[in-house]
Every structure is written in C-alpha cells, then in structure tokens.
Amino acid sequence: MQGRLQPGGPVVLVTLACPAHGVSVERTGDGPLSLEGDPLVVSSAQAAHMLDKVGLPVAGRYVISADLLPGGGAGMSTAALVALARAAGCDDSAALARACLAVEGASDPLMWSTPDRLLWASRRAEILQRLDPVPACEILGGFWGPPQRTDPEDSDFPDIADLVAAWPGADLAAKADLASQSAQRCSSLRGPVDDPMPELGKRLGALGHARAHTGPARALIFAPGTVPEGAERAMTEAGLSDVLRFATGGGA
C-alpha cells in the first residue's frame, strides 16, 4: 500500500518484500571510487554521496548487479545504495535510512530486516508504526509499462488512513483486499485507467493485486499453492514483461 496518512499527511507505504530478488554489490578493490555492473542502478555521484553520508571514504571499486528493472517501482535504487554502503562497511540501518533519504529524497525501508512489517514514511525515512507479519503468500509479478523514477516532490497520492487502520491483525485475504483498494485508489487518481491487473486477478483467482505507486511494477497475490497453471503466460499476454513468481510473508 502507499498513500497519504490523512489528507495533507505524510506519504506512507507498506512494502511488498521480495526476498528472491534484489541488488548485490561486491567490493573488488581499493583506489578511487569506481562502479561497474549491468544494469547500473546508481550513479557515481549518488554512490559518492551515499558513502559520504554514512561516514565512509569515497573510494573503492564495486561491482553492482540488479536482477529487477531500475525505475520499475521495485526499490532497486534504494537497494543498490544500501548494498553499496554495506559492502563498504556500514550496517547501521538507521544511518542507512538517513543516507538514502539524503541521496534520493525518498526511500523504501529495505535497510531493515523485516521491511514489510513497517508503516514507512518514505519522504522522511521514518518508521511510523511496527506492523504484524504478512501471512505466507505467493506473488506473481511483472512490469506493465516503461520505467518511471520516483519524484520525491510528488505527494499527489490518495488518503489511505482507513486502509492503514485496518491492516493490523487482518488475515491474508483481508490484507490482499486492502492492497487492491490502495492500488485502485492510486489508479483512479494518477492513472493509468486501463491497468489490466484487477480483471486479470479476478480471472486467475487471485486474492488481490498490488502496484508500484510510481513505476510499472504490478503483482497478483495468491494463497500458497493456488497460482493456476498458465498464469505466467496470462500475465505476458496481458502485456506484462519480466514476469516472476516468488514466495513472501510468513517468515519467507
């Protein structure tokens, strides 16, 4: 979910954790700061800023590997900054959060060990509330449309205070429905109007759907073991690219 906590309130989110995918960074040597990798999800200037903000030397050779689309709304830029700083020697989650905010102006809570158990103020890098674990589920995801980087000055999101209030203690079906409501409010306010996920979810028997509120990432939420045969093909036929399937929640 993502939106405003009351009209005029902070932009908040509950992230969808994807433990099977992300960014890896390896420090391969000393010397002046040097980045290699394909795709390169963080610029040299951003890397230098990040290292400086966590109090580490702006130096070293790093290889960065991301296995999801940069600008896709899957948190790859934040993940890259966090992985870079950890490879350089910083593992202080609060310091990493502050540094990511300074570099990007907005961040995902990926520096924390259980990011999907946080109500996160993304433009403040603050934990507003600790939440209950997400029940075990299967996600069928992909990307619908071109990459779109987050604009930290963009706060034109719907009010989701009622959805946030209903989240604690909700079971998987109820949480999936809350995610669907958040996605639908975002699409109604910001577009696109032809998002295929609500209808696709109904056709495939998903409990609900989720979307990146900036970026093309989309997901269907299923109870474990209930993704139907041919679902990946149906996603591709609906126009999604890089379709992937993973388990999350329940300690996954």
Residue ranges and their predicted role:
Residues 1-71:
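ATP-binding N-lobe of GHMP and related small-molecule kinases
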Residues 57-61, 93-98:
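Short, surface-exposed acidic
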Residues 49, 53, 80-83, 87, ...:
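Generic beta-strand or strand-like secondary-structure segments
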Residues 94-209, 221-252:
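ATP-dependent small-molecule kinase catalytic core of the GHMP/sugar-kinase superfamily
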Residues 72-94:
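DPxDG-like acidic metal-binding loop motif
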